[in-house]
Amino acid sequence: MLTSWGKTGFVLALALGGRAAENVITSDTFFYGESPPVYPSPEGTGAGDWASAYTKARAFVAQLSDDEKIQLTAGVSSNTACSGFIQPIDRLGFPGICMSDAGNGLRGTDYVNGWSSGISVGASWNRDLAHSRGAYMGQEYRKKGVNMILGPVVGPLGRVALGGRNWEGYAADPYLSGVLVSESVKGLQSQKVATSVKHFIANEQETNRNPTTDSERNVVQSVSSNIDDKTMHELYLWPFQDAVLAGATNLMCSYNRVNNSYACQNSKLLNGVLKTELGFQGYVVTDWGAQHAGIASANAGLDVVMPRSSTWNSNLTTAIANGTMEASRLDDMITRLMATWYYLDQDTEFPSPGVGMPSSPSAAHQAVIATSPEAKPILLQSAIESHVLVKNTDGALPLKSPKLISVFGYDAYAPLTYDLGNNFDFSSTRVRSDLYKNGTLYVGGGSGLNSPAYIDAPIDAIKRRAYEDGSSVLWDFTSENPSVDYTSDVCLVFINAYATEGYDRQALSDTHSDSVVENIAGNCSNTIVVVHNAGIRTAEAWVDHANVTAIIYAHLPGQDIGRALVRLLYGESNFSGRLPYTVAKNSSDYGSLLEPSQPEGKYQYFPQSDFSEGVYIDYRAFDKDGIVPQYAFGYGLSYTTFEYSDLKISKNSDGVPSIYPAKASILPGGNPHLFDELVTVTAKIRNTGNVDGQEVAQLYVGIPDGPVRQLRGFDKVLIESGSSATVTFSLTRRDLSTWDANAQEWSLQRGTYKIFVGRDSRDLPLEETLVF
């Protein structure tokens, strides 16, 4: 039986008002029981379409010696650049497993592409593009002999506005993240490459993500994300559930603690939620160095340790002998690992693990070319749809044959050196700059870096277009207050907002970049600002400046960063990106969710991050508190306009559906009745402008006693000028339910639901009601 974290409200009654230093907690025994124990670890069953893989895996495991079983539970060093490596069992024809970073393309190797980042996929709001991007990335991983990609990312979700890794995920919304991770998993695994969906779970800040030692040599443990059962299910678990439903073969447990139990040894999460409630058939791997217990972590549901384990090894055999661990648990750990290998047919026609991943690109090695001409259109389209136009005064864009283009800002040119993305830092203190002055920001920092085949910088693409048009180009990339030619037809200003693994950002804007924009706008009546942003970037200093005629949030488009932008600037492509987060007028509008939690008072050795806001993050919080954003979640402009009409809602069956879903055998993703389609919604959209364009129709639901509105559907449609299209949304039982912590079930609400359809979370011209 599953145990709830709390029947009502917040799970941990921490003494938030009295965190006095004189009562400093020095032992984790203080927190025992806050994450309820769930044992034993359930064995994989082969449910769903896993039956054949489990039959093969069990036959394989039956042939292993105890020593061979143990060697498959942890990584080893290899002569490759694989981030992690499971050693081979030669006598059984098992070649081993290569795992490698990351979710935006391969890092640290040659002959691969640098794809748009997760935040850019989120900005695209495009299911099909997410799938295609995943498939072409998967081809590259496969050619390089990478069995498992360490991604995609849906944790962090984006709770903390300054979160250092928000850019690796898709959106500050569980529904949008869930749809996009589902399509990404399907695309990647269509190429027989395993996915490691990460970081499970509530990994919402980089500050104190790992244990540290203070100046007095006291150990400060990883931050604890203290979260109630309802919030866990309705926000943070939601996209992981979608990933499991899509067939994800691996989940990576995170560095943080959850309700004061380390995520990689949290039996409630691994045994209870993931392997029982969601019916997960794959295996759980640690984030690198995230194992903090030995046999206890195995019993809690951890299957594989990376990059190696100092606590398992022969201790597993000893534990089985003395009864502290069942032999069946060890067998299940290996069965889950091997079932994944068989599930993706990696036992047939898969390249040798790590064959295209030389340990050092500067050493002699065979060139394994993973790029392909067929990927080019998807690379470019992914970059194009990364861009969100949020301001366009008096038709400043598209550009109209400018005679003189002046280009400014440190973000316009390609980095002066490029080393295949090998430089990153896993620290966890806040000391990094929030801008990247070494060139255009095509990707964020850390293990999510990629290794582009080239970088087509904005200035390079602008010069190519200027050559074709006979335009002149002036530039100054270094001056904070540059001279501006009076006859400039347009001034393009390039700035960025940097973020990296290991650090949370210090601010949502920076004075240097703001000064550059203001100084140029003061001397140029047609100033267009392009921001390459690894997360939210506020613009209160210049957003309303009369001479700032257009603003583009370009996010992290990957290697086609310049080519994509120029197509948009000149109207060869239309803007169709939409914001996957809320941009506030002032940073203070994010309230307690602006900054990460810090060690303090009695919890200085056991940092606490209390998710007391519940489900109210990003636009839900702005709606709840009545705060008007600068740019709403889902907002974005186009070169055309759209008109909405004719909203229709129909129930898919007569009668009133039951409050709880019917009982059923658990399949990967959970109770299959959660995904029964209960309601169909349609609306008509007409392109009222003069050019063709893609509109992102968004459906929000107001569930009784819940947030004002929650995203529960979207459809991106291409509509020709003057034409109309009908968009259709299907609402499942889960879409219309809330989590009942008492019953441990998803529950439909009796009463009146509100259904909204429109352009973004604040511009919803169509509204109807639905009664259950």
Curated annotation (Swiss-Prot):
Gene3D superfamilies: Glycoside hydrolase family 3 C-terminal domain, Glycoside hydrolase, family 3, N-terminal domain, Immunoglobulins. Glycans are attached at N259, N315, N322, N438, N523, N547, N574, N586. Its main location: secreted. It is an enzyme of class 3 (hydrolase). Keywords: Carbohydrate metabolism, Cellulose degradation, Glycoprotein, Glycosidase, Hydrolase, Polysaccharide degradation, Secreted, Signal. Pathway: Glycan metabolism; cellulose degradation. It catalyses: Hydrolysis of terminal, non-reducing beta-D-glucosyl residues with release of beta-D-glucose. GO terms for cellular component: extracellular region. Transmembrane segments: none annotated. It comes from the Eukaryota. It is found in: Secreted. The active site is at D287. This is Probable beta-glucosidase M. It comes from Emericella nidulans (strain FGSC A4 / ATCC 38163 / CBS 112.46 / NRRL 194 / M139). The gene is bglM.
